Regions:
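Flexible, membrane-associating and regulatory peripheral segments of lipid-active enzymes
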Residues: 1-34, 57
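Generic preference for hydrophobic/aromatic residues in regular secondary structure cores
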Residues: 12-14, 150, 167
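Serine-dependent carboxylesterase/thioesterase catalytic core
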Residues: 35-45, 49, 55-165
Length: 167
């Protein structure tokens, strides 16, 4: 994961939004778009192979970079919201949102930030890969805000579980 594509090639493959203007009334996109959210100590370069595959298959996509790298997970929700909006405007459909590791927690925090009745219209499905939903033991050693938020059984993780909407 922390290879060449992380620090140096993260912008080698651009986001792909085939229709940058809103769809005409009655017009339907043929492929659902995807938003890709990386994990801790990564950037959008994590998704380069996925981005190439999505474009080859005709799926609009946006891969975000969560900044600042050691910021609060809650502060990343605006980045997710903007990416979802971009994909939805390009396709006319709510996207699939994929989060890896901490990215899955960011997506859950974004869902929690939405008005209760709007989540279904904003996102088609959420997929999390390797997400520490209950936290991680490594979080107790972290000096970063987001690392501490991911502490196993920590306050932030418990609060997220209590406040997020029912699935």
């Amino acid at each position: 994961v922390f290879g060449w594509r992380q620090p140096f090639r993260h912008n080698a493959v651009p986001d792909w939004l085939p229709s940058l203007s809103p769809l005409s009334p009655g017009q339907q996109a043929t492929r659902r778009g995807v938003v890709l959210v990386h994990g801790f100590l990564c950037n959008r370069g994590f998704w380069l192979p996925w981005m190439a595959a999505l474009r080859e298959r005709g799926h609009a996509h946006v891969a975000v970079t969560l900044e600042p790298a050691f910021g609060s997970i809650d502060d990343y929700t605006a980045t997710i919201d903007a990416a979802v909006q971009r994909v939805q405007e390009a396709t006319g459909m709510a996207p699939v949102v994929v989060g890896h590791s901490m990215g899955g927690l960011v997506v859950r925090a974004w869902l929690r930030s939405l008005p209760a009745d709007s989540a279904a219209a904003r996102v088609h499905r959420v997929i999390t890969l390797g997400t520490p939903h209950g936290g991680t033991w490594a979080g107790r050693f972290s000096r970063s805000v987001n690392g501490q938020q991911m502490a196993l059984g920590g306050e932030w993780v418990r609060q997220l579980q209590q406040e997020e909407p029912a699935a």
